[in-house]
C-alpha cells in the first residue's frame, strides 16, 4: 500500500468525511447506547451508505468507514456471533466503497478533474469507544495493558485491511499507551499498512490522558507507517498550540475539530458554541496557512454543508 502517501504529495489539501452520528440524529435516528450509530449497521445499513454518498458529493477525498464503534467485543455484547460481528465490520467497507463509486459515476469529467478519486479510510476508533464512558476525553483506561489493547484492535484492523481499505484512520486516541499499542501492532503484524493517527486534547500542550504533545510527536515521528498526525474531536480553540508542537514529528498534519459545541461526557449532551466563534472554514484556512495542515475536515456536530464549504474554499 502506498496510495495514501502519493495523495499526500498532491498540492491541494485533502478533505475528510464529516460526522456520521450527527447525520443519523438529524434524520431522526436514536444513536444512544454503546454502539451509537453502529447499531444501524444491523438495522438500516442503507441509511449509512446514503450518508456516505452525501459526503462524497460534498467533496470528501477520504471516506471514513462506519467502524468507529464497530468492534468485535461491542458487537458480540450486542448479541451477535463472532462470525456475524466480522461480517458487520466488513460491511462498513463495502458501504463506503458503494457510496464512493455510486457518486463518482455521476460526476462529469470537469468535476473529476478537480479532485482525486476518493480513498477509503478504515476507521479504528479508540478502546474508549467500546467502553462508552466518555474516556475519549480523559484517556482513563484503568489497568489495561499494551497486550490487551493490541488484542482489542487486531481483529478489526485485519478485517478492514482484508476488505481493501486504502489506509487506516486511528482516530480519537486519548491515551499514550493506546497510541504505542497501535503503532507497534502495525509494525509487527501489518507492515504494509498506511495510516494516520489523531488524538483528543482537553488542555493546552497535552493529549487527554495528560501525556505531553512533545512526547506524542516523538512517539509518532518514529513510525514509518503513520503518515499523518493531528487532532480531532476537540475544541478548535486548542488546535493552534497543539499543531505548533505536533509539526515537530515531521508528518503531514490533520485537523478535524468538533463544531465548537462542547460535549459533556457526564450528561452525554452538547453545550452551545460561542455565537462569535469562527467557522470551520475560517479555522481550517488559518491552520492551513500557519502550519501547512494537509488534511482538513470536521468531527462531531459537523455536517455535509461544512465539508462542502471546505471543498469550495480549497478546490474552487
Region annotations inferred by a language model:
Residues 1-316:
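Domain-level signal for soluble alpha/beta catalytic cores
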Amino acid at each position: 500500500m502506498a496510495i495514501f502517501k502519493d495523495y499526500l504529495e498532491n498540492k491541494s489539501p485533502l478533505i475528510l468525511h464529516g460526522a456520521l452520528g450527527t447525520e443519523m440524529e438529524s434524520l431522526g435516528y436514536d444513536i444512544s447506547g454503546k454502539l451509537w450509530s453502529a447499531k444501524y449497521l444491523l438495522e438500516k445499513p442503507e441509511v449509512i451508505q446514503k450518508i456516505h454518498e452525501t459526503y462524497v458529493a460534498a467533496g470528501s477525498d477520504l471516506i471514513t468507514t462506519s467502524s468507529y464503534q464497530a468492534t468485535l467485543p461491542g458487537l458480540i455484547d450486542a448479541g451477535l456471533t463472532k462470525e456475524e460481528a466480522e461480517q458487520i465490520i466488513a460491511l462498513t467497507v463495502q458501504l463506503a466503497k458503494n457510496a464512493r463509486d455510486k457518486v463518482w459515476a455521476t460526476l462529469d469529467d470537469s468535476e473529476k478533474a478537480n479532485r482525486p478519486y476518493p480513498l477509503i479510510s478504515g476507521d479504528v476508533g479508540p478502546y474508549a469507544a467500546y467502553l462508552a464512558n466518555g474516556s475519549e476525553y480523559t484517556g482513563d483506561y484503568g489497568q489495561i495493558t499494551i497486550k490487551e489493547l493490541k488484542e482489542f484492535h487486531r481483529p478489526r484492523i485485519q478485517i478492514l485491511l482484508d476488505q481493501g481499505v486504502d489506509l487506516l484512520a486511528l482516530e480519537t486516541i486519548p491515551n499514550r499507551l493506546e497510541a504505542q499499542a497501535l503503532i507497534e501492532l502495525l509494525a509487527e503484524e501489518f507492515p504494509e499498512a498506511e495510516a494516520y493517527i489523531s488524538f483528543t486534547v482537553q488542555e493546552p500542550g497535552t493529549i487527554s490522558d495528560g501525556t505531553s504533545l512533545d512526547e506524542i510527536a516523538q512517539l509518532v515521528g518514529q513510525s514509518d507507517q503513520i503518515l499523518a498526525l493531528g487532532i480531532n474531536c476537540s475544541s478548535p480553540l486548542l488546535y493552534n498550540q497543539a499543531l505548533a508542537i505536533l509539526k515537530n514529528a515531521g508528518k503531514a498534519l490533520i485537523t478535524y475539530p468538533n463544531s465548537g459545541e462542547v460535549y459533556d461526557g457526564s450528561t452525554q449532551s452538547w453545550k452551545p458554541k460561542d455565537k462569535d466563534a469562527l467557522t470551520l472554514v475560517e479555522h481550517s484556512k488559518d491552520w492551513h496557512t500557519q502550519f501547512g495542515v494537509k488534511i482538513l475536515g470536521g468531527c462531531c456536530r459537523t455536517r455535509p454543508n461544512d465539508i462542502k464549504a471546505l471543498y469550495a474554499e480549497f478546490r474552487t
